[in-house]
């Protein structure tokens, strides 16, 4: 099966509305798996309620049978290639947003996530074929 990878700001896991369900059902009907890393515009309160599973060597939130959130600091083996994932980013407009409504602190990588990413890369001898990210961090933990 083919994989379609979206690099952040997925937008289909927001509030459980009929709009979310319409698009997730549509994505699930396609002849490929939809994989995404988180961006800085995600509803992390909802996203983090999904079950964590292993998929192609890394941890994911399974959203639907063919829709997966590739979690931060993981390496996935897809079609013979290693993909390292580091989602998130910094919202430049945070001063105009409301926490837990349209902005979440979880958009920024935590120290624990950074440590996990380094450990994962160490286990893979710092050899991956692709790095998937959404945004460049202006700072790090």
Positions of PLM-derived features:
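Core catalytic region of metal-dependent phosphoesterases/phosphodiesterases
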Residues: 1-78
């Amino acid at each position: 099966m083919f994989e379609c990878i979206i690099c952040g700001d997925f937008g289909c896991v927001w509030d459980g509305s009929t709009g979310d369900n319409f698009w997730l059902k549509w994505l699930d009907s396609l002849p490929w798996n939809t994989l995404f890393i988180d961006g800085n515009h995600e509803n992390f309160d909802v996203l983090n309620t999904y079950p964590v599973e292993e998929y192609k060597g890394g941890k994911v939130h399974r959203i639907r049978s063919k829709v997966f959130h590739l979690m931060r600091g993981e390496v996935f083996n897809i079609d013979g290639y290693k993909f390292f994932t580091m989602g998130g980013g910094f919202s430049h407009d945070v001063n105009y947003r409301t926490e837990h409504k349209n902005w979440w602190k979880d958009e920024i990588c935590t120290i624990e996530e950074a440590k996990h990413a380094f450990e994962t890369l160490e286990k893979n001898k710092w050899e991956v074929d692709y790095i998937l990210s959404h945004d460049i961090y202006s700072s790090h933990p």
